[in-house]
Amino acid sequence: EIMPSLVGSEMCIRDRSKGRYHIVSSEQMKKRPMKDLLVSLEKLGAHIEYDENEYHFPFTIGNTGEYADTVDINVDKSSQFLSALLISAIVMEKNFTINVTGTHGMAYVEMTRLMMKQFGLDVMQDKKNNSFIIPKKAAYESLDYDIEPDVSAACYFYAMSPLLHVKSKVMGVHQNSLQGDVAFLDVLADMGCTISDEADGIVCMPPKNAHIHGGSWDLSTFSDQALTLAAIAPFANAPVGIEGISHIRLQECDRINAIEENLTELGVRVEEIENGLKIYPAERIKPCKIKTYDD
């Protein structure tokens, strides 16, 4: 029995093994949409028996003994599905092709591809046909590897810089990071901060005039920072548009709704736009209890 955290690649590998594995999860993970990945695994030869709701945890996974060498995957709900297939493709016995539909989160997929290359596995990418090819008998090489700091978490500290008008530095974070969330620093620069990449980490200095600039940004390639930007948006001198984030409704909770509800409780004016939110400057912030939605 397995309790998953980042379960996608784990399931793909189990699909190719000879055993049967029962995978359970937290109540919150049971709500996460998994259908696109699980359908792809079934087409690759997985046999899945669901304990409760179809295409959701918990379930038992084994294999039918029949294997395909091509699979289609849609990434509109989560790019993790594609990353899982890429990472685990080395267990396939033939050249393996993954055909991709959708464009969400491809910066995270590129991070996966580059890390695989660092471990000696160069995934071929056919951009014309939007597919990835992993050669048969591919294997990872062992090596000593320095893991980058979590840029998603680092962004919280960088966001404090314009709010508190202080210098913020996170050790080990650099502009050449594989992680797409490093693009959030470009947003802070647009808002008036000064960003400098020093030898031991990136420094964020607050706006010189203490004014945080408003504007509109497409966060489709680093959507984890939508909540971070939403938290500082009420303190900007003009409205802040957060675009390209419609897919975050399908994560551990409806994160667009979570942003809107909590900011409204704080006295902030928020409007839903086609694929995101517009947040207006707040004259004052009202005390309230912040709902976390078990996220």
Where are the regions a protein language model picked out?
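Self-splicing inteins and homing endonuclease
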Residues: 46-75, 121-151, 163-166, 184-221, ...
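Single conserved hydrophobic/aromatic residue that forms the stacking wall/gate
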Residues: 1-8, 13
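Secondary-structure capping and domain/repeat boundary segments
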Residues: 9, 17, 79-83, 87, ...
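Short, recurring structural edge motifs at helix starts
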Residues: 26-29, 71-74, 100-103, 144-146, ...
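A generic, well-ordered mixed alpha/beta core segment in the N-terminal half of proteins
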Residues: 10, 14-50, 58-61
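Internal metal/ion-chelating core segments
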Residues: 75-163
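C-terminal structural cap/anchor segments
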Residues: 221-279
